[in-house]
C-alpha cells in the first residue's frame, strides 16, 4: 500500500510513535522493527522533557545499534528521523577516527561538528524572522549609494519602488560591504589530520566584537548582487548571536542525533588482535565510551554535555559480530535492531511506492525534455529480478543496486532525450532484457558495470 502524507491531530509532545512510523513509511520500504525502535526512542525524548524535577536528568536516551548489510535503509531511517523533528543530525563513519595520541581525528570532533550544525540551524531560523527588516535596511543602504543620504524622501521613495520592481537590478553602484577576507586565526586544518580543525573563534570576529565594528571595503557591483550580499549582513546585525549560541547548544544537547556508521569496522576480531594490523581499534571504542555514556566536550561555542544526545550506531557485521565490540560499548547501545536483506517484493516497492521513488525521479528528469517516460509492470518486475540476481551473485549492496541498473538501462534514453521532444517512451520487460541481459549473464562484466 502506497504511503501518503497525513495530517495529524496536534499532540503536545509532537508525533506519536505510530505517526513517526507512518511518516518513515512514506520514504522507506519495510524494516518495521528498526522504524519502531527509532520511533520509541524519539517519543521517549519528548516524554523526558515533561518529567518533573531531578528525575528528568537521570533519564538518558536508549542508544540504538542497527545491524544490517549496506543499502537496506539504516542511514535513511536515521536521516529521515532527524528531518521529521528538525533535530541537529550528524553522520560519520567510525573508521574516520583514531585513538587519542595518534595522527587523525579524535571522537570529540563529532560533538563539535554537531554543535556547528545546530548553530547554523538556529541562525537560519533567526534570519528568517528578521528577513523583512533586513531587506528594508539593505534597500536603505542601496538608496544611499544611488541617490545620496541627503536626498528627499520623495526621491528615495521613487527609487525604492524601482528597486522593488527590479527595474534597477542591472544598475552598477559603489557600496561599502563587510570585508570577509580572513584576518588570521579561524578554524584551520591541523597538519596530518584531514578534516580536523581547531575549535577557535575567528580572530577577525573577536576584534570586530571588541571594537563594536567590523572592517568594510568599497566595491562596485550591480544592485541585484548588492542585495544578495547586504541582506545577510543586515540579518547578522539584527540577530542576537549569544542567544543563538545558547539555543543551539541546548538544541544539540537535548535533541541532537549522532549516526555512527561502519562501527563493525572498529570491532576487534581475534585475527586483528593477533596481527595488530591497524592502529588500536579498541582505542577508538574506548574513546567513544565516555561520549556515548555522557561527558562534557569543549567547543568554540562553549561546553556541551552529551548525556542526552541520541547515538545510533550501525554496521553490516559480515566479519565481526556485535559481541566483538567492547562489552562496555555494547552496554551503551542497549537497543539492537536487525534489518532484513531486501527481497524481490521489497525492490519492487522501492521502485514504486516512496514519494521520491527512483521511477518518479527518472520520469521527472526525462520529463523536463518534454518526453513522457513510463514503466510497464513487467519492466519493474524484471528490474527487481536483475537487482536481486546481481546482489546474490556479485555483492549485496541492497537498494543501491537499483541506481546502477537504472543508469545503465536508461543511458541511451538520457543521452538522446533532448532530440525526442513530444514523444512517449514505454519501458517493458523486453526493453530491460535487451539492454541488460548480456551484462547480467556475464558476472565478470557485471562486477564492473553493475
Curated annotation (Swiss-Prot):
It is found in: Cytoplasm. GO terms for biological process: protein unfolding; proteolysis involved in protein catabolic process. GO terms for molecular function: ATP binding; ATP hydrolysis activity; peptidase activity; proteasome-activating activity. ATPase subunit of a proteasome-like degradation complex; this subunit has chaperone activity. The binding of ATP and its subsequent hydrolysis by HslU are essential for unfolding of protein substrates subsequently hydrolyzed by HslV. HslU recognizes the N-terminal part of its protein substrates and unfolds these before they are guided to HslV for hydrolysis. The keyword Chaperone applies. ATP binds at residues 29, 71-76, 261, 328, 400. The gene is hslU. NCBIfam families: hslU, PRK05201.1. It comes from Rickettsia rickettsii (strain Sheila Smith). A double ring-shaped homohexamer of HslV is capped on each side by a ring-shaped HslU homohexamer. The assembly of the HslU/HslV complex is dependent on binding of ATP. The lineage of its organism: Bacteria, Pseudomonadati, Pseudomonadota, Alphaproteobacteria, Rickettsiales. CDD domains: RecA-like_HslU. HAMAP family: HslU. Belongs to the ClpX chaperone family. HslU subfamily. GO terms for cellular component: HslUV protease complex. The keyword Chaperone applies. InterPro entries: AAA+_ATPase, ATP-dep_Clp_protease_ClpX, ATPase_AAA_core, Clp_ATPase_C, HslU, P-loop_NTPase. Keywords: ATP-binding, Chaperone, Cytoplasm, Nucleotide-binding. This is ATP-dependent protease ATPase subunit HslU.
